[in-house]
Amino acid sequence: MCGSLVAMAMTRQLITLADGRTLDFFVSGDDGAPLVVDLPGTPEGHRLLPSLEEAAATTGVRIAALARPGYADSTRLPGRTVADVVPDVLAMADVLGVQQFAVMGTSGGGPHALACGALAGDRCVAVAVVSSVGPWAAEGLDFLDGMGEGNEVEFGAALEGEKQLRKLLVLWREEILAAGEQGTLASLQSVLSPPDQKVMTGEFARHMHESFQLALENGVDGWGDDDLAFTRPWGFDLARLGVPVFLWQGEQDLMVPPAHGRWLAEAVPNCRARLLPEDGHLTMLLNRPAEILADLAAELHGQD
């Protein structure tokens, strides 16, 4: 999976925000390189995949992966909306000494990346959304249609409210962490399409389990708050997106069905969509980082 290149050294940073919260992020790459902000999925940790870190080095960008509030050591922000991630991203960029950046969001990170494109002004120059969910109540999109059983159960609990959702997620967290890699695999089984089943082995399976461990080490706050935010208004208008948006969607995705990608491709201005018939959800994380980052790198280098 890692190829022959040596990845840049990855460092973890914790900063204190103006409101007193802690923000947790990883950074990899040269300080002077253009910055890509990585917003992971739900409920993924923010430690960079080796394939993503390597792709960043190849394309000449620095990458910073942010743990949203409630994940890892980032302090919870109760009742947060999707849009609430934007001030955190800007604060992280300020600490890193970066004025302009691009944003990549995968799966549950996708809406948050779009929020940056809509609300961060001229500081965000481009967005990539990979296997991103669409808005819950969007006209013309049946959010749950085509999703695997696990996702249907999860969002069904979210609609019943925070108490019921938390009860479910606490149980799932215990099962995942207690059973190791096999627990992670079992938790994903109902949403793994054939292409994703093929890659959920070996080093990648270990990374995914460690990612879940990192995200959930302090509880399920981030996971639950993500789910609740997805079932509510996102807090911004997609029509406000004026930056280039690169959309990647696998046609064999059971976590986020391709209808979400097609809907976003129509709804988002300046969207350049790639709908890939052979890909699922996890295959995008493993096999496509270099292509995804190449789009963003071109936009960032164009700002020089």
Question: Can you say where each PLM-predicted feature lies in the sequence?
Answer:
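Conserved HGGG/HGGXW glycine-rich cap/lid loop of the alpha/beta-hydrolase fold
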Residues: 21-73
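Short beta-strand/loop motif that positions the catalytic acidic residue
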Residues: 241, 247-249, 253
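Conserved alpha/beta-hydrolase "acid-adjacent" motif
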Residues: 254-260
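Conserved acidic catalytic loop of the alpha/beta-hydrolase fold
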Residues: 84-101
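Catalytic active-site module of serine/aspartate enzymes centered on a nucleophile-bearing elbow/loop
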Residues: 270-304
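Conserved hydrolase catalytic core segment
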Residues: 100-142
